[in-house]
């Protein structure tokens, strides 16, 4: 992932302003440590921090059209860039970068070209011919993006809050699947799939079609000129990503450059479910497997850095981001710059355990629609920022546009969870890859119960976080929570603890509004809480809160009051710039 910052229509075009823009852009340097660039035209600045993945030698940004009157700063990967180049025979490209097509497509097709892009992206394009600009974000918000407005009438656009939060009077999340145009001074939705209306689809389920679509989604994401690997927790989603990657890697350009031996990575507490399952899958697939161990105290020591980088106070996201944040640093230290990950599957197929209680296929489908629309606030945010904190890029094939549109066109009756018929969560995805002749995975892995990432790294991780918060947030503080935090008032001590840290980094009112709120159980939306009356008594985002569903649900688990937060001797992470020494097993 790269980092982009644009300041458009500012009243000050002095050298001091340029220096300030560069200073703010450097706050995003963790996202793109390989190169930095800036383009200044009149009252507009485009800045870029580059993570070089495709064409590392010549793809520096900002990028331009032939006469340099159209400039663009991009964070993303355009997987169909070669096909798009073929549509532009009269254009000359300066680089081999996949993002180089954007300025030329705009010159040829105007603002509507965004629909032609297949990939993950956020960009700002400046047309100096008429001093206008557009900005756009990918369909699901895989890449992070924010927009703000200054008192001088300027528009600010940044990959992260930290690039603009103390320069703008007001700022907000740039909505996924939208284009912002200076000509209209407003947003237009460019991604309008049939499922977005939440109408109930009726296409029959075809396992081979679904399998083929996912394999193509993975193959697209093997476009790289740098070393890469896969994140492998041993759960269904990451295991399928690893299995398909391993099966199709040989013969690709990436394999010719870096070899066909796939590397896989897993993180967890000693003895965690993910470490055990991840190693088993890695052994089955023959990957070079790397395990990263952390302790509860390691994670607690990193919480402040995690909140600074992830830019949220959402409990679920912070729980899951912390081990991913720790793992990403170690992956990058091994020389890897890109990983393929399994985010998005649970939202598309109703994989969260609370979907067991969906009353009918209509409610099931509408909830999946709501979950996909909110991905940019949760799992996409985590996957993007936890990896980008260390200059690592995460690609997510389950959020391929074509794959999502296909999967969301299937009659949701096929997705319904029916234990009496042997259909557990994500049954249609499991069935699609249940190949007796050429198995992708062992049966017990293919049908392993869903674990949320924050649960799978080790159940004591969440319990340890709660115990730590108990020591730092008093009952009196909780009584006054509604007065201190009137918006999205924290309902638990853990939530209060995260909120205090967040507001120390991002004190503006606009910042707190960028984070979603509302009741949730096991990652549900507020609407789905009504599916089971008992859930309102235990609004915890852990999958174990889905009582009566998870094998290790909270009703069978040790209560938090019996746990103590304990200082571990093995590791101290310190702050973000200090060394972290996690145990590595390869």
Swiss-Prot record:
ATP binds at residues 231, 267, 341-342. Pathway: Amino-acid biosynthesis; L-asparagine biosynthesis; L-asparagine from L-aspartate (L-Gln route): step 1/1. The active site is at 2 (for gatase activity). Keywords: Amino-acid biosynthesis, Asparagine biosynthesis, ATP-binding, Glutamine amidotransferase, Ligase, Nucleotide-binding. SUPFAM superfamilies: Adenine nucleotide alpha hydrolases-like, N-terminal nucleophile aminohydrolases (Ntn hydrolases). It is an enzyme of class 6 (ligase). One of its GO terms (biological process) is L-asparagine biosynthetic process. This is Asparagine synthetase [glutamine-hydrolyzing].
């Amino acid at each position: 992932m790269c980092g982009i910052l644009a300041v458009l229509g500012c009243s000050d075009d002095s050298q001091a302003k340029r220096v300030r823009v560069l200073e703010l852009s450097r706050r995003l340097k963790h996202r793109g440590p390989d190169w930095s660039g800036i383009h200044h035209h009149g009252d507009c600045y485009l800045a870029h921090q580059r993570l070089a993945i495709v064409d590392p030698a010549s793809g520096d940004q900002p990028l331009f059209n032939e006469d340099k009157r159209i400039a663009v700063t991009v964070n993303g990967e355009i997987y169909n860039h070669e096909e798009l180049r073929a549509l532009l025979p009269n254009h000359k490209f300066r680089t081999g970068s996949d993002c180089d097509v954007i300025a030329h497509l705009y010159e040829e097709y105007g603002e509507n070209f965004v629909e032609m892009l297949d990939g993950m992206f956020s960009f700002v394009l400046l047309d100096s011919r008429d001093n206008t600009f557009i900005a756009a974000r990918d369909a699901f918000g895989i890449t992070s993006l924010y927009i703000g407005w200054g008192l001088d009438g300027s528009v600010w656009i940044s990959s992260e809050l930290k690039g603009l939060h103390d320069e703008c009077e007001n700022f907000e999340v740039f909505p996924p699947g939208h284009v912002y145009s200076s000509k209209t001074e407003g947003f237009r939705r460019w991604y309008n799939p049939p499922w977005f209306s939440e109408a109930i689809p009726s296409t029959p389920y075809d396992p081979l079609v679904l399998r083929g679509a996912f394999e193509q989604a993975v193959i697209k994401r093997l476009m790289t000129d740098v070393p890469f690997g896969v994140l492998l927790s041993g759960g269904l989603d990451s295991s399928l990503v690893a299995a398909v990657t391993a099966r199709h890697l040989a013969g690709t350009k990436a394999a010719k450059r870096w070899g066909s031996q796939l590397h896989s990575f897993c993180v967890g507490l000693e003895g965690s479910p993910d470490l055990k399952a991840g190693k088993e899958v890695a052994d089955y697939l023959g990957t070079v497997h790397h395990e990263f161990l952390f302790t509860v105290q390691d994670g607690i020591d990193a919480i402040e850095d995690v909140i600074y980088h992830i830019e949220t106070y959402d409990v679920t996201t912070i729980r899951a981001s912390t081990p991913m944040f720790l793992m990403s640093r170690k992956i990058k230290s091994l020389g890897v710059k890109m990983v393929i990950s399994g985010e998005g599957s649970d939202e598309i197929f109703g994989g969260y355990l609370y979907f067991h209680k969906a009353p009918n296929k209509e409610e099931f489908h509408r909830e999946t629609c709501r979950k996909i629309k909110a991905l940019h606030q949760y799992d996409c945010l985590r996957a993007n920022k936890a990896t980008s904190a260390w200059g690592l890029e995460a690609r997510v094939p389950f959020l391929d546009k074509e794959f999502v549109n296909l999967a969301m066109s299937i009659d949701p009756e096929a997705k319904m969870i029916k234990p009496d018929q042997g259909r557990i969560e994500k049954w249609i995805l499991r069935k699609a890859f249940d190949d007796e002749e050429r198995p992708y995975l062992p049966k017990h892995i293919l049908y392993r119960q869903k674990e949320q990432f924050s649960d799978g790294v080790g159940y004591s991780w969440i319990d340890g976080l709660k115990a730590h918060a108990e020591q730092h947030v008093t009952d009196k503080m909780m009584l006054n929570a509604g007065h201190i935090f009137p918006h999205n008032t924290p309902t638990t001590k853990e939530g209060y603890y995260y909120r205090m840290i967040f507001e120390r980094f991002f004190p503006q009112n606009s910042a707190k509004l960028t984070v979603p709120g509302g009741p949730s159980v096991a990652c549900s939306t507020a609407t789905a809480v009504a599916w089971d009356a008992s859930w309102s008594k235990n609004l915890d985002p852990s999958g174990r809160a889905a009582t009566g569903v998870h094998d290790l649900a909270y009703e069978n688990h040790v209560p938090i009051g019996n746990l103590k937060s304990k200082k571990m001797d093995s590791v101290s992470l310190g702050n973000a710039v200090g060394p972290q020494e996690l145990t590595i097993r390869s």
